Amino acid sequence: MAITASMVKELREKTGAGMMDCKKALTETNGDMDKAIDYLREKGIAKAAKKADRVAAEGLAYVKAEGNHAIIVEVNSETDFVAKNENFQKLVAELASHLLEKRPASVEEALEQPFNGGETVQEYINSAIAKIGEKLSLRRFEIVEKEDGDVFGQYIHMGGRIGVLSVIGQSSDEELAKDIAMHVAAINPTYVTRDQVSEDEVAREREVLKQQALNEGKPENIVEKMVEGRLGKYFEQVCLLDQAFVKDGDQKVGKYVQSKGATVKEFIRYEVGEGLEKREDNFAEEVMSQVKK
């Protein structure tokens, strides 16, 4: 399989590895991105890549709660300048309020809904595009329902670059819920508990860690014990309750929440532009010059 500049670029962004290391990894794995990531990790060249870690597009993440329902939404713009525009910020807030009230099932359904009794949501966005002068788009949203004895946590970081919505069970402690949301914004866990990590993912991680240990020249009779220890570190990276609490590093999030008589039911974290690729003028040429060598 031919290794393209865009493939090298994607692997480089996902792993932080050097250009030629990325090219070699892709060549050795016949262009399989996931296997190339594992190859680099086994060689000790790259750390675990988080899912959807390419952040490039601009816009705002926004969180709003009313009663037992809350919404987290992302609206994209082309530039950071527009994301700071008051008219754009008003648009995002109005869209969030509308979506929370009408509760459409998808972005497609939302765009076709009447807005303020007249134009559709898409037409409302189009009129904003005409005024602001940039392409704007409702990228995604999620509406969450809680029970009466639960509490929502909301946190917006960097003026809307990151938004988090948390649901804390058996509690009315809004400060606790916000603190958990803030932790999620800062540390970016993938799961609440270890139980949510699939068996396939754990098996894949265990194999990568085993190859790492063997490549380090460790004796086979202690490799398994090392793997289990390192697997614990992996869970600390991806599972919220296993992580050191960002406001008190001596305490795990799980123990802290438990001390408050509460539970973490779920969280949703939006980082503006994650998974989207930004146009770059010269990078592709730089990569190709290396790939062709």
Curated annotation (Swiss-Prot):
It comes from Halalkalibacterium halodurans (strain ATCC BAA-125 / DSM 18197 / FERM 7344 / JCM 9153 / C-125). The keyword Cytoplasm applies. It comes from the Bacteria. This is Elongation factor Ts. PROSITE patterns: EF_TS_1, EF_TS_2. Residues 79-82 are annotated as: Involved in Mg(2+) ion dislocation from EF-Tu. Belongs to the EF-Ts family. It is found in: Cytoplasm. Keywords: Cytoplasm, Elongation factor, Protein biosynthesis. Associates with the EF-Tu.GDP complex and induces the exchange of GDP to GTP. It remains bound to the aminoacyl-tRNA.EF-Tu.GTP complex up to the GTP hydrolysis stage on the ribosome. Gene3D superfamilies: 1.10.286.20, DNA helicase RuvA subunit, C-terminal domain, Elongation factor Ts, dimerisation domain. PANTHER family: ELONGATION FACTOR TS, ELONGATION FACTOR TS, MITOCHONDRIAL. The keyword Cytoplasm applies. GO terms for cellular component: cytoplasm. InterPro entries: EF-Ts_dimer_sf, Transl_elong_EFTs/EF1B, Transl_elong_EFTs/EF1B_dimer, Transl_elong_Ts_CS, UBA-like_sf. One of its GO terms (molecular function) is translation elongation factor activity.
